[in-house]
Amino acid sequence: MITKKNLAIFEINECDFKYFLKGATKYQFPLIKNYFKKKNKITTFTIDKEEGLNLDPWVQWVTVHTGIRSSRHKIYRLGQKLNNRTKQIWDIISLKGFSTTLWGLFNSNLRKKKNIDLFFPDPWSFTQKVYPQEFNDYLYLPKYYATNYPNIKLSKIIYFSYKFLKKVIFSKSFFYILKNFFSFIKIFSLAGLKSFNLYFFLDLISLEILCKNIEKKKSDFLIVALNSFAHYQHNFWDDDRFEFIYFWYLNEMIKKINYLEGYYNSTIFYNGFEQKKIKKKYFLRAKNPKRFLKILGLNFKRIEPNMTTGAQVFFDNDKDKSKCINFLKSIYLLDVPLFDVQKFKKNIFFKFNIYLYKKDFNIENLTLLNKNKYFNYLKKNNAKGLIYNNHSMLKKIFDNVILMKSTSEHTPKGTLYFKNIKLNKKQIENTKIFSKITNHFSL
């Protein structure tokens, strides 16, 4: 019998619960519907409204984990480090003497290791390390793929896949893959190595690893973050060919979550905030951000790509930093810059602003001869056009970018399912979740 105060939280980033339940009926996965029927539900909201600035997961999850709004914690980019004065939920709970496991949380920081059983950073983190180190081989593959997509080197993928699979094979998790071998064959025959399929697979195996780990040592406090459903909705929500795969993985993950919840009296299943389906559009992304800036003649120390259209760039000196800022800001769309550039003390962040509503226009071969045609095309599709008088530089830019599809946008509201934890109101701001969780371990 479970007697000690405990809590398991599953942060399924930006998932759409209505879509979950609709698909569960359509594809006959009753386990999914039954899982949510057994739980209480509240809605959450954030006062942040601007996608690309503060209405993003690497911002909102920091708000949830610290209990303070983004205007105070000022974390707006993947890989940014929270100041040490701001306490995270696990900082407080571990100090109370409760053992803790953290897996894949956006912009999470491990400060003290006392009462931390396992810390597995999100794959976009460039500063946080796995603890204990025996879990390192699980991180190399998702980290390389996440921070280098779409410019993936086959040799690197093979090497990191070998390290990952070797670790899985010599663990009990391999038996799960063997048991479901033919199901995986079917899924990969349908979707191949498309990014969403790999993210789903890695999230599912992460849960399987945690199931085996909890059998050996159960933490009092468990937080697991999964991003694969958000990735699918952002990039493939318009493609019905792969919808079954989404719900097959969801059903398998619910099985694992059910198993993990069996070790806990209290549970939370939360999406942070939701996405809404939109008319698909395409945005620009550098094929390789590091090479992209070098081709433009810019000097820098290192670069940390994010999961969308930009990257953080660090410099050896202020001269190189200023040159980069001035150059990127000098390139304009009809009425706004091609790049959004933000300046920080030690680095800058840049991203593309342009988007299109059709992919059939060959933007990569843009020349002066078709400039007017291009403007008319963009205006017709409610997009923005490019003005730049250095034509050779323009060609360099468009030769080194690709068009990425987007099929959803963020909304400021979320849904939280829970069991055996005090959440009395029907709606709360996401900043209030912090105190509800810390108070749970005080009662």
Say what each PLM segment does.
Residues 19-23, 112-114, 233-237, 278-282:
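A short acidic (Asp/Glu
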Residues 9-11, 31, 246-285, 416, ...:
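Metal-dependent active-site segment of extracytoplasmic phospho-/sulfohydrolases and closely related
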Residues 66-237, 323, 436:
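His/Asp/Glu-rich, glycine-adjacent segments
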Residues 260, 264-316:
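Acidic/histidine-rich catalytic neighborhood
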Residues 20-59, 68, 72, 99-103:
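Short, structured active-site-proximal loop/turn typified by the sulfatase FGly-forming signature C/S-X-P-X-R
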